[in-house]
Amino acid sequence: MKTLEVKTSSATYPVYIGDGIKRNIVDLMTSTGHSYTKLLIVTDTAVDAIYGDEMVRLLEQKWSVHKVVVPSGEQSKSFAEFEHIHTKAIQFQLDRSSCIIALGGGVIGDLAGFVAASYMRGIDFIQVPTTLLAHDSAVGGKTGINHPLGKNLIGAFHQPKAVIYDTSMLETLSQTEMRSGFAEVIKHALISSEDFLKELMSIRSLDECSKSELAHMLYQGIEVKASIVQKDEREQGVRAFLNLGHTLGHAIEAEYGYGVITHGDAIAIGMQFALYVSEKKLGLSLHRTELKEWMKKLGFPVQVTQDISTKTFVDRMIGDKKARGGTVQFVLLKQVGDAVLQSFTKDDLHQWLDEWKREEGCL
């Protein structure tokens, strides 16, 4: 088992990564030093079918445990499910000494974390990620739900008390889900280290990753995320670099429809656009074509479809929560491991997106 400590201005908590460590979840939770009256497991239908009963059985060794199950998919990051979980928490008589267990992927972590942040003005929660994608979202304290007009527009910063990452649970993921999570690993490499990126690009198939390779990759990705969050918990500065590819990526998700395209696939396209602009505007020296072809071989889409106009995407980006006064704070790379923020107007975005689409043959 690997252990990593996350330190922010508001909290310090451990991240445990290992094969089969869910069997020790009671000991791991107890070791944090927090005492709980009741636990509420929040999970989705897909995860519940595989791990729900086992997790209840493990946690009931020490605590009174309740469970609420929401539909699988991005659609559950909604006002309706947010209210539904609150209703269950009230019915189960959770108090301020209770704890919510987020058992699932990024959707569950965001949703359950936001419930924890708001229920009785804030109770503890613990992340138990079951997807590769959640290696990014489980650390850092961002919680929230979507609005029909945009992704993650309603939420709060609320750090977990621990992250318990059992890599054996990744074995049940589909190829699509693994790829979605791997996009965030690529992002962490791009903003941190040429060596990390080269290591990733030696992977020819996600199916070929051994458990030890997977744990090592996750540790590196989480280490990058933790080091940034420790410097900037509330995204006033360098934490914004974690949004590489996310401005267009979120626009793609919102426009295509949440759940129609995976988060990782949308971010993969967004990163291709960001790297194009970085190359043209900042002189980024990166074998962009080589990276694009490698990502295509892994199954990623690398360009937008022709049926949605540039204006539609630009309007979505201007409405993004990272926009300021009609301009978008866009993450670019001077070089691998050296990210910067650039302000783009609506006209700037339209020009760059048109030029990129023209190069890709999808204008």
UniProtKB/Swiss-Prot annotation:
<dbReference type="GO" id="GO:0005737">
    <property type="term" value="C:cytoplasm"/>
</dbReference>
<dbReference type="GO" id="GO:0003856">
    <property type="term" value="F:3-dehydroquinate synthase activity"/>
</dbReference>
<keyword id="KW-0456">Lyase</keyword>
<dbReference type="GO" id="GO:0009423">
    <property type="term" value="P:chorismate biosynthetic process"/>
</dbReference>
<dbReference type="GO" id="GO:0009073">
    <property type="term" value="P:aromatic amino acid family biosynthetic process"/>
</dbReference>
<keyword id="KW-0057">Aromatic amino acid biosynthesis</keyword>
<feature type="binding site">
    <location>
        <begin position="130"/>
        <end position="131"/>
    </location>
    <ligand>
        <name>NAD(+)</name>
    </ligand>
</feature>
<keyword id="KW-0170">Cobalt</keyword>
<keyword id="KW-0862">Zinc</keyword>
<feature type="binding site">
    <location>
        <position position="142"/>
    </location>
    <ligand>
        <name>NAD(+)</name>
    </ligand>
</feature>
<dbReference type="InterPro" id="IPR030963">
    <property type="entry name" value="DHQ_synth_fam"/>
</dbReference>
<feature type="binding site">
    <location>
        <position position="184"/>
    </location>
    <ligand>
        <name>Zn(2+)</name>
    </ligand>
</feature>
<keyword id="KW-0520">NAD</keyword>
<keyword id="KW-0963">Cytoplasm</keyword>
<feature type="binding site">
    <location>
        <position position="246"/>
    </location>
    <ligand>
        <name>Zn(2+)</name>
    </ligand>
</feature>
<dbReference type="InterPro" id="IPR030960">
    <property type="entry name" value="DHQS/DOIS_N"/>
</dbReference>
<dbReference type="Pfam" id="PF01761">
    <property type="entry name" value="DHQ_synthase"/>
</dbReference>
<dbReference type="GO" id="GO:0000166">
    <property type="term" value="F:nucleotide binding"/>
</dbReference>
<keyword id="KW-0479">Metal-binding</keyword>
<comment type="similarity">
    <text>Belongs to the sugar phosphate cyclases superfamily. Dehydroquinate synthase family.</text>
</comment>
<protein>
    <recommendedName>
        <fullName>3-dehydroquinate synthase</fullName>
        <ecNumber>4.2.3.4</ecNumber>
    </recommendedName>
</protein>
<dbReference type="GO" id="GO:0008652">
    <property type="term" value="P:amino acid biosynthetic process"/>
</dbReference>
<dbReference type="InterPro" id="IPR016037">
    <property type="entry name" value="DHQ_synth_AroB"/>
</dbReference>
<feature type="binding site">
    <location>
        <begin position="106"/>
        <end position="110"/>
    </location>
    <ligand>
        <name>NAD(+)</name>
    </ligand>
</feature>
<dbReference type="Pfam" id="PF24621">
    <property type="entry name" value="DHQS_C"/>
</dbReference>
<comment type="pathway">
    <text>Metabolic intermediate biosynthesis; chorismate biosynthesis; chorismate from D-erythrose 4-phosphate and phosphoenolpyruvate: step 2/7.</text>
</comment>
<keyword id="KW-0028">Amino-acid biosynthesis</keyword>
<comment type="function">
    <text>Catalyzes the conversion of 3-deoxy-D-arabino-heptulosonate 7-phosphate (DAHP) to dehydroquinate (DHQ).</text>
</comment>
<keyword id="KW-0547">Nucleotide-binding</keyword>
<dbReference type="InterPro" id="IPR056179">
    <property type="entry name" value="DHQS_C"/>
</dbReference>
<feature type="binding site">
    <location>
        <begin position="72"/>
        <end position="77"/>
    </location>
    <ligand>
        <name>NAD(+)</name>
    </ligand>
</feature>
<feature type="binding site">
    <location>
        <position position="263"/>
    </location>
    <ligand>
        <name>Zn(2+)</name>
    </ligand>
</feature>
<dbReference type="InterPro" id="IPR050071">
    <property type="entry name" value="Dehydroquinate_synthase"/>
</dbReference>
<feature type="binding site">
    <location>
        <position position="151"/>
    </location>
    <ligand>
        <name>NAD(+)</name>
    </ligand>
</feature>
<dbReference type="GO" id="GO:0046872">
    <property type="term" value="F:metal ion binding"/>
</dbReference>
